[in-house]
């Protein structure tokens, strides 16, 4: 088989030798840097058809179609209606003109009466129609020579969304037609999938074609939103950005609540979330883009079948979310019918099965409501401090950040939360270096291995994932963390794997990749050929696409053939071209004399003679004349003359063909081995998915432990509830205490936050002035409770948090014009959901209840809500400015009155933002209005009106509590690093310890720890002064000091040539001491003969240069 590669695709053709008219065989090379990688001189490269069946499909495609009828079926008509609806949203003038030329009598929308519109059997349009009939709701792109073309409806979509111009302009007598060059395929696919369209790509079978016969074509792959086109990736050296997978989503309703099914075609898996509230369902829809949305008929409430099911009563929020999307209705059994729809959408066989990734759990908290998620910044919301940004350092993004977000939106079960918390605790205290935690998308990994398109880069990344897991298994401090991560990974993937089995399978997979993939850059066989007579650039371009991919032992025969053919080519060039060049050099002539050289024609992938004026005017039988007579014009792949200055000989052409054949055979063997490796790893795909997710979780939790340590957050005591009905609640299960709570968006280490202590054993009724901090307190409590039940650190000095079954926060409401609801209606809808779901294990936080309606009736509604929540036994806070609620005859028995404090400063009342006992009837409304710039005249008039009507109630009543004395945990001792054996840099480590020991009060306490080439420092270094020694790849040392060791290591490794640097470090007490030790090490190590890269830094200070030290020079180490 032969093959051809482009930047975006690799297409194949069978070895039809009898079609070659010449004995010369031609080939191409794979050059990622070239915009068009189609070989123009030599016939193409290596087949990537899966097997003989693929060729069979190509050659028999037309036979199947001849039996089909030209009459449209009902199903075809439904597809055309679907496309008509999409075309109605087009707005570009050029697209609208193309739409006018469509005729909806076939799936392509072609008008046969227009120019190039014929659908005659056997022509290109007819062939494209057959492919379109297999995937009628996908945009069809067909490879035609140097372009990918679309016609009819698909051309209109390309012009509208991909920014392409119609072929032939806007001629009214021609069918709509558009396309893109092959080097722009990836960009075109991205534009289409970004707008929600799926694309079917049809490739040509490349190679020579018999006269009067058309090229074979086949469907090479699909591009869907969240699932890119990967065909041909195995043969290129660049990585592919893989977006988050987008599932097909189905929504239904039953007596248990709403049900949401998400089916991931790439992973062949689905998740089923049942018993959801409307708010939780909308939250999931907001955070998960879907490829297709299907709505079950059970959502319709009335018999008329109208789709506006939320016009009255429940469902308005969901309707507002769904009405802005494209959706379809379906009936029947929800799961089986939805799976059937998915198989139709993706063209899957009925035998394909999907795995349920749900892990059953009896005590998992309910997912967050949309209002709760937005008001604490779990979902990015304008004007709301983002919770995710303070949980992780800025350097941690992507997959780990998405995991933390999903963890907050769907809090884990109690036992999983405990595992996560215990993991974070261990992570915050480890002293050994940690791996880099290579993060790979599971969907990307599965698709590339399944399609056998994983390239060298991806295999190296997979091996890094496996090696990171094995690194954790080898270290005593990290192996316990690895064991703890097994359950959270099980919940995230739905895969339950035994720990020992997992480790053994990781060993096997890592060894399998290591046996095949070339990881040693110094292997001599991986160097491209070099010959004196041929430009090095030629060999580099021809061989760099396969050299260094697999170990030489697997391709010894192919490498030998390449080297022999390269030597033969060099010999042919020397024999045919060198005498001519020698003759030219021996000629002494003024300006305008003969010129000649051996040159590399990059575009034609050939080595030819390039010269002019070298032919003698008189043939005298001198040296070089015979070679000149052998020269003939060089021809390109189409047989056309390249230029007047390019020449070759039959001997050189034969040598070139043989070299290209040997090089392409080597490349074919390399890709064959890579595909075989993909097949082997497919048998361990579950282990690879599990390992990739485990590392994502590891990186997320390690990063959180580092950031929480920097912010001086704490791990709360998490108290569970008894699951037995009628059992007494566990000790502390009905009480939440947060000591020294600070708003999560403030950095505690900066000292600007106001701390509050919240000891909650019942429902609080909270009052306070405007700007007094009520909303901030509710957000802070909500965030702390959510972080606690998720197993994460909280912004407090100490905390004891029950494992709530739900956390519900309601703050300000806005109107919803989509479903015709006022802001008060929206608020009441949310209050209904909260009241109906609140239990004795819930945390309910309502800010300024009933603010959007008439005061008297709003006060009564608020009082009734408070009674209902009190009856449920939940913990929580209801804040209000409706002071009339204190005059109502409420039956609530467990209400505690709380207020946000205020104090008088120079005759003005100002808030303290402190939580106190009692009731505060002062609103500070006038003061707030003044502060916000309301005209003085307006405020004065307001004060006069107030005094005239409410003078008798003007005095504020504030009941203040005794001062609460809280204790902070400032006496915690930082654990001293535990020494660990290191096998690398022993001599250097001993020298560092010996030098620094002279300055230490307790020399025996010195520990010099190491960080490997692909490792990072542990979280215990966060906030500590460190002295470090970097061992560069050039064997020189760089000595420095820093208070941010991880950041400094990343900065060093970001520089060219320093990616593989390893480090030794020790933690000291204070930056001044670190500076002294830095200077001391620079001078002392230099005297001991070590080569330093920053020797000049030893002269910056006047200390550390002498070996005689006074007592005052002695410092202590952490």
UniProtKB/Swiss-Prot annotation:
It is found in: Mitochondrion; Plastid, Chloroplast. Disruption phenotype: Variegated plants and appearance of specific new restriction fragments in the mitochondrial genome. It comes from Arabidopsis thaliana. The gene is MSH1. ATP binds at residues 768-775. Disulfide bonds: none annotated. The keyword DNA-binding applies. DNA mismatch repair protein specifically involved in maintenance of mitochondrial genome configuration by controlling specific rearranged portion. Functions by suppressing asymmetric recombination at some repeat pairs. This is DNA mismatch repair protein MSH1, mitochondrial. Changing residue 1018 to L: Variegated plant phenotype. Belongs to the DNA mismatch repair MutS family. One of its GO terms (cellular component) is plastid. Coiled coil: none annotated.
């Amino acid at each position: 088989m032969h093959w051809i590669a482009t930047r975006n695709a690799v297409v194949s053709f069978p070895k039809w030798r009898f079609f070659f008219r010449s004995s010369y065989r031609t080939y191409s090379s794979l050059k990622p840097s070239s915009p068009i990688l189609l070989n123009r001189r030599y016939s193409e490269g290596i087949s990537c058809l899966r097997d003989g069946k693929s060729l069979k499909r190509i050659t028999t495609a037309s036979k199947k179609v001849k039996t089909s009828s030209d009459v449209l079926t009902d199903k075809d008509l439904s597809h055309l209606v679907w496309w008509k609806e999409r075309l109605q949203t087009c707005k570009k003038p050029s697209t609208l003109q193309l739409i006018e030329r469509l005729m909806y009598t076939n799936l392509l929308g072609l008008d046969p009466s227009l120019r190039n519109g014929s659908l005659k059997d056997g022509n290109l349009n007819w062939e494209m129609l057959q492919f379109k009939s297999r995937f009628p709701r996908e945009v069809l792109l067909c490879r035609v020579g140097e372009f990918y073309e679309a016609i009819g409806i698909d051309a209109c979509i390309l012009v509208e969304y991909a920014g392409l111009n119609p072929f032939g302009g806007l001629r009214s007598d021609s069918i709509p037609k558009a396309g893109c060059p092959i080097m722009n395929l990836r960009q075109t696919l991205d534009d289409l999938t970004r707008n929600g369209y799926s694309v079917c790509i049809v490739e040509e079978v490349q190679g020579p074609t018999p006269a009067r016969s058309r090229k074979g074509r086949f469907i090479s792959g699909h591009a869907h939103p969240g699932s890119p086109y990967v065909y041909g990736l195995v043969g290129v050296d660049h990585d592919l950005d893989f977006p988050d997978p987008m599932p097909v989503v189905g929504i239904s309703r039953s007596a248990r609540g709403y049900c949401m099914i998400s089916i991931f075609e790439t992973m062949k898996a689905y998740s089923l979330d049942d018993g959801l509230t409307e708010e939780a369902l909308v939250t999931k829809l907001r955070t998960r883009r879907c490829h297709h949305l299907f709505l079950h008929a059970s959502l319709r409430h009335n018999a008329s079948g109208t789709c506006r099911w939320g016009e009255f009563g429940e469902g308005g929020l969901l309707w507002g979310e769904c009405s802005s999307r494209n959706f379809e209705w379906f009936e029947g059994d929800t799961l089986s019918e939805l799976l059937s729809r998915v198989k139709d959408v993706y063209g899957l066989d009925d035998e394909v099965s999907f795995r349920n990734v749900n892990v059953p759990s009896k005590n998992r908290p309910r997912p967050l409501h949309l209002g709760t998620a937005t008001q604490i910044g779990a979902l990015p919301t304008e004007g709301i401090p983002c919770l995710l940004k303070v949980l992780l350092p800025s350097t941690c993004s992507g997959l780990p950040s998405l995991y933390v977000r999903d963890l907050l939106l769907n809090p884990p079960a109690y036992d999983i939360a405990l595992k996560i918390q215990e993991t974070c605790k261990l992570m915050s205290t480890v002293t050994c270096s940690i791996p880099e935690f290579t993060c790979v998308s599971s969907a990307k990994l599965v698709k590339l291995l399944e399609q056998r398109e994983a390239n060298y880069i991806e295999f190296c990344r997979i091996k890094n994932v496996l090696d990171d897991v094995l690194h954790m298994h080898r270290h005593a401090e990290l192996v316990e963390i690895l064991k703890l991560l097994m359950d959270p990974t099980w919940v995230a993937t739905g895969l339950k794997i035994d720990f020992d089995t997992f480790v053994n399978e990781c060993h096997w997979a890592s060894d399998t990749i290591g046996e095949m993939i070339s990881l040693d850059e110094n292997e001599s066989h991986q160097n491209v050929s070099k010959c004196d007579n041929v430009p090095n650039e030629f060999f580099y371009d021809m061989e760099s696409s396969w050299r260094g991919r697999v170990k030489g032992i697997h391709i010894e025969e192919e490498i030998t053939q390449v080297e022999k053919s390269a030597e033969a080519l060099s010999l042919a060039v020397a024999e045919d071209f060198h005498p001519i060049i020698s003759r030219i050099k021996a000629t002494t002539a003024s300006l305008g004399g003969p010129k000649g050289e051996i040159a590399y024609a990059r575009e034609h992938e050939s080595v030819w003679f390039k010269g002019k004026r070298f032919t003698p005017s008189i043939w005298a039988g001198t040296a070089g004349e015979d070679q000149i007579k052998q020269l003939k014009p060089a021809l390109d792949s189409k047989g056309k003359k390249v230029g007047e200055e390019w020449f070759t000989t039959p001997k050189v052409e034969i040598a070139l063909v043989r070299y290209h054949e040997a090089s392409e055979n080597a490349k074919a063997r390399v890709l064959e081995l890579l595909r075989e490796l993909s097949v082997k790893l497919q048998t361990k795909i579950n282990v690879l998915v599990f390992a990739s997710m485990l590392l994502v979780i590891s990186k997320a939790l390690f990063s959180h432990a580092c950031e929480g340590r920097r912010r001086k957050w704490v791990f709360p005591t998490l108290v569970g509830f008894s699951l037995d009905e009628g059992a007494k609640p566990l000790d502390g299960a009905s009480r939440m205490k947060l000591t020294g709570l600070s708003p999560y968006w403030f950095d505690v280490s900066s000292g600007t936050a106001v701390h509050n202590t919240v000891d909650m054993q019942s429902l609080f009724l909270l009052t306070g002035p405007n700007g007094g901090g009520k909303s901030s307190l509710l957000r802070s409590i909500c965030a702390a409770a959510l972080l606690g039940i998720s197993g994460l650190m909280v912004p407090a000095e100490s905390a004891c948090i029950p494992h709530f079954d739900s956390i519900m926060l309601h703050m300000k409401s806005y109107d919803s014009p989509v479903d015709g609801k006022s802001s008060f209606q929206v608020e009441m809808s949310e209050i209904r959901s909260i009241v109906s779901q609140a239990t004795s294990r819930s945390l309910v936080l309502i800010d300024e209840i009933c603010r959007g309606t008439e005061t008297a009736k709003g006060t009564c509604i608020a009082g009734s809500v408070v009674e209902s929540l009190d009856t449920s036994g939940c913990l929580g806070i209801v804040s209000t400015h409706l002071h009339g609620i204190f005059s109502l005859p409420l039956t609530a028995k467990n209400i505690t009155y709380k207020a946000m404090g205020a104090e008088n400063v120079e005759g003005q009342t100002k808030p303290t933002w402190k939580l106190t006992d009692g009731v505060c009837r002062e609103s500070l409304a006038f003061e707030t209005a003044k502060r916000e710039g309301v005209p003085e005249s307006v405020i004065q008039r307001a004060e006069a009106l107030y005094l005239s009507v409410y003078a008798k109630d003007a005095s504020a009543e504030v009941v203040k509590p005794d001062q609460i004395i809280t204790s902070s945990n400032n006496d915690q001792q930082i654990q001293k690093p535990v020494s660990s054996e290191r096998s690398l840099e022993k001599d250097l480590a001993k020298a560092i310890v010996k030098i620094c020991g002279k300055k230490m009060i307790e020399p025996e306490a010195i520990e010099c720890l190491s960080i490997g080439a692909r490792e990072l420092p542990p979280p215990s270094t966060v906030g500590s002064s460190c002295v470090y020694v970097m061992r560069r790849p050039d064997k020189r040392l760089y000595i420095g000091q820093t208070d941010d060791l991880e950041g400094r290591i990343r900065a060093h490794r970001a520089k060219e040539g320093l990616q593989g640097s390893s480090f030794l470090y020790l933690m000291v007490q204070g930056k001044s001491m670190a500076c002294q030790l830095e200077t001391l090490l620079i001078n002392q190590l230099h005297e001991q003969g070590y080569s330093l890269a920053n020797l000049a830094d030893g002269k910056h200070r006047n200390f550390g240069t002498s070996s005689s030290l006074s007592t005052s020079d002695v410092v202590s180490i952490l």
